[in-house]
């Protein structure tokens, strides 16, 4: 039986990803004004009603309305298909972080318990799974396409045969204007599918599924409710490699759901870059209020070129895995999280955990 693995990605106009972008825009804005702030933000979007809730501890007062409008403007009101300035209604319920949690975080402990994973593979220059990168590349091409027939909501899914090194099926669902000419629409979409595959040295001989229901006019938050933190596969490795129990977006880096996931990725990538293994998965585990991780493990799936004992000793000797050590090494208080809230947190140039 062939080893066919499937990865997925969503566009920045998908309602869940809109919520992630708003949450991370709030995190970035607050940290730019207060490096000591604690931020945990969740968003829910349905039709033109947005609800922002969470815990924020800071003396700075963010302009939530302006932040939200900036996010929608970046996505594009025309692509969203509705006038957000006239229609958008925002509800806000934000309180301070629990003092019981702050007791542990203030002394440098983890902001919560949890497990986090990082993954890397040498199959692409980005050290990411090839079907994930192809799906992501397709949606980036779609986002930048000048045609007005394309709307903001879209999803892509790529099935890849690791035995033959070929894509077997490329699926996409792309929201479009109601007056679209189906033949023109399909031709452009299929051309972008092939172009995305060619970017990674693959041919265009695969099954192409474009809007299998036949129509995708009603989309975004008018078709589906959006919620922060629901697209973990899209945010991480597309479904290859395990994921931790917590989402990344909407959290300041004292939350190890975010910071430890970035460090685990860096460690896995460093191991692959050093030639110690062809692919690597790192697990980190933390207890709330405890400074050191309670667990560190490395899995190389039999691809290691050094012993696992050597690799584990390398990790132990090379990385400060305390929350504050991670924040300092990766400069996480200065990251613009708007850069990672859509099209993935990993495999992008210019991010400290990718360097």
Show the residue positions of the predicted features.
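N-terminal, positively charged regions that mediate nucleic acid binding
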Residues: 1-40, 45-46
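Short connector loops/turns at beta-strand edges and beta->alpha or beta->beta junctions
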Residues: 2, 46, 121-122, 237-243
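Internal helix-turn-beta structural module
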Residues: 3, 46, 279, 283-355
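Glycine-rich, mobile lid/loop segments that gate access to catalytic sites or pores
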Residues: 6-9, 66, 70-219, 339-342, ...
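Alpha-helical support elements that line or immediately flank enzyme active sites
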Residues: 12-31, 120-140, 253-275
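A short glycine-rich, hydrophobically flanked beta-strand micro-motif that places a catalytic Asp/Glu
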Residues: 37-41, 150-160, 206-210, 276-287
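Short, charge-patterned binding micro-sites
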Residues: 40-58, 288-292
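Glycine-rich anion/phosphate-binding loop at the beta-strand->alpha-helix junction
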Residues: 179-271
């Amino acid at each position: 039986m062939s080893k066919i693995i499937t990865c997925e990605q969503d566009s920045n106009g998908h309602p869940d990803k809109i919520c992630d972008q708003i949450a991370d825009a709030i995190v970035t804005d607050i940290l730019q004004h207060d490096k000591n702030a604690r931020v945990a933000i969740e968003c829910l979007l349905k039709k033109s009603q947005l609800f922002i809730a969470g815990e924020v501890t800071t003396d700075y007062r963010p302009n939530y309305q302006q932040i939200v409008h900036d996010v929608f403007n970046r996505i594009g009101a025309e692509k969203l298909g509705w006038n957000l300035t006239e229609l958008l209604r925002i509800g806000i319920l934000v309180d301070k972080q629990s003092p019981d949690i702050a007791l542990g975080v203030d002394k440098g402990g983890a902001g919560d318990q949890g497990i986090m994973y990082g993954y890397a593979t040498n199959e692409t220059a980005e050290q990411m799974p090839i079907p994930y990168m192809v799906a992501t590349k397709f949606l980036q091409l779609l986002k930048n396409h000048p045609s007005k027939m394309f709307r903001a909501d879209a999803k892509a899914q790529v099935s890849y045969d690791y035995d033959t090194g070929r894509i077997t099926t490329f699926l996409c669902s792309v929201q479009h204007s109601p007056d679209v000419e189906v033949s023109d629409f399909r031709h452009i979409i299929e051309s972008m599918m092939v172009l995305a595959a060619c970017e990674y040295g693959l041919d265009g001989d695969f099954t192409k599924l474009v809007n299998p229901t036949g129509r995708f006019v009603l989309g975004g938050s008018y078709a589906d409710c959006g919620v922060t933190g629901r697209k973990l596969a899209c945010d991480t490795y597309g479904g290859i490699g395990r994921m931790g129990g917590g989402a990344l977006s909407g959290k300041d880096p004292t939350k190890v759901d975010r910071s430890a996931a970035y460090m685990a990725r860096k460690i896995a990538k460093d191991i692959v870059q050093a030639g110690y293994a062809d692919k690597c998965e790192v697990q980190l585990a933390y207890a709330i209020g405890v400074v050191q991780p309670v667990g560190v493990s490395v899995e190389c799936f039999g691809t290691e070129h050094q012993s696992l004992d050597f690799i584990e000793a390398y990790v132990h000797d090379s990385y400060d895995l305390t929350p504050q050590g991670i924040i300092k090494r990766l400069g996480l208080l200065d990251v613009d999280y708007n850069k990672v809230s859509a099209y993935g947190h990993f495999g992008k140039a210019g991010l400290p955990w990718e360097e």
